[in-house]
From Swiss-Prot:
Keywords: Cell projection, Cilium, Developmental protein, Differentiation, Flagellum, Membrane, Mitochondrion, Mitochondrion outer membrane, Phosphoprotein, Spermatogenesis, Transit peptide. It is found in: Mitochondrion outer membrane; Mitochondrion; Cell projection, Cilium, Flagellum. This is Spermatogenesis-associated protein 19, mitochondrial. One of its GO terms (cellular component) is sperm flagellum. The gene is Spata19. Essential for sperm motility and male fertility. Plays an important role in sperm motility by regulating the organization and function of the mitochondria and is also required for correct sperm midpiece assembly. Residues 1-24 form a transit peptide. Disruption phenotype: Male mice are infertile, their sperms exhibit disorganized mitochondrial structure and the sperm-abundance of mitochondrial proteins and activities of mitochondrial respiratory chain complex IV, and ATP levels are significantly reduced. Epididymal sperm possess seriously disrupted midpieces, leading to a severe reduction in sperm motility and infertility. It comes from Mus musculus (Mouse). GO terms for biological process: cell differentiation; sperm mitochondrion organization; spermatogenesis.
Length: 154
């Protein structure tokens, strides 16, 4: 009976000329200016600390250590958006792009110089760290009553 009802529903929609499944745009634009400014402040602070740290490490580690092969686990990505660029084009799109680039850059561009002998150990340690982090997030969201309520509505 359920299958027959669905078949009739689909047939009726196609007969009338409506698509199945219905095209519904469920994405709603939400702008949280306070959250954006907090993230932007955090990213600027992290950017300054990271650039200072990278400059120090690069000046200290100009040559390979003890003749070992050196592997860099992340490439250093350089983006040249400065505050003067923001003043010339203060649109929201540029601000969002800059925030996105900074977040990606500083969350993925830590430079770790590792001798080739310990490369596998370092990679396994990083994988375990990510798994623990994901597991922790899943446990936190499961224990959050508002998350369970929103999931039960799905």
């Amino acid at each position: 009976m359920i299958i027959t009802t669905w078949i009739m529903y689909i047939f009726a929609r196609k007969t009338v000329g409506l698509p199945f499944p219905p095209r519904v745009n469920s994405d709603i634009e939400v702008e949280e200016s306070e959250a954006v400014s907090v993230v932007q402040h955090w990213l600027n602070k992290t950017e300054e600390e990271a650039s200072r740290s990278i400059r120090e490490k690069m000046s200290i580690n100009d040559s390979p250590t003890h003749g070992h092969d050196i592997h860099v686990t992340r490439d250093l990505v350089k983006h040249h958006l400065s505050k003067s660029d923001m003043l010339t084009d203060p649109s929201q799109e540029v601000l969002e792009e800059r925030t996105r680039i900074q977040f990606i850059r500083w969350s993925h561009t830590r430079i770790f110089q590792v001798p080739s002998e310990v490369m596998d150990d370092v990679m396994q340690e990083r994988i375990d760290q990510v798994r623990r982090s994901v597991s922790h997030l899943m446990c936190d969201s499961y224990n959050d009553p508002s998350f369970r309520t929103s999931c039960s509505e799905c």
